[in-house]
Swiss-Prot record:
Belongs to the bacterial ribosomal protein bL20 family. PANTHER family: 39S RIBOSOMAL PROTEIN L20 (PTHR10986). This is Large ribosomal subunit protein bL20. It comes from Afipia carboxidovorans (strain ATCC 49405 / DSM 1227 / KCTC 32145 / OM5). GO terms for biological process: ribosomal large subunit assembly; translation. Pfam families: Ribosomal_L20. CDD domains: Ribosomal_L20 (cd07026). Keywords: Ribonucleoprotein, Ribosomal protein, RNA-binding, rRNA-binding. GO terms for cellular component: ribonucleoprotein complex; ribosome. The keyword RNA-binding applies.
């Protein structure tokens, strides 16, 4: 049976790990065992971070909407309830963006929600 030398494949695998560990400090960037562990952990953090990002942005949008509806005498929850009753279907991301960049349009939406709550 022929002898299999794995130097080429091992080098390619290591090169891939070192590329991913670029920018790491200390042994984590140039020792394969430490680099592999560091890259694995970095990928775990990245995975969790992608999930947290969605929660954080939704929370930010809600805070912005809440701050924007307070001058109209509403709270966030009453505002959302008013939107549902009036049949307005706009997501929180767009509402937040409107509150910042188009205050007049947001005010019209807030007044519509307030009217739906009163009725």
């Amino acid at each position: 049976m022929a002898r299999v030398k794995r130097g080429v494949t091992a080098h390619a695998k290591h090169k891939k790990v070192y590329k991913a560990a670029e920018g790491f400090r200390g042994r984590r960037k140039n020792t394969i065992r430490a680099a592999k562990a560091a890259v694995d952990k970095a990928q775990q953090y990245a995975y969790v971070g992608r999930k947290l990002k969605k929660r954080n942005f939704r929370a930010l949008w809600i805070q912005r909407i809440n701050a924007a509806v307070r001058p109209f005498g509403l709270t966030y929850s009453r505002f959302i309830n008013g939107l549902a009753k009036s049949g307005v279907v706009i997501d929180r991301k767009v509402l937040s963006d409107l509150a910042i960049h188009e205050p007049a349009a947001f005010q019209a939406i807030a007044e519509k929600a307030k009217a739906a709550l009163a009725a």
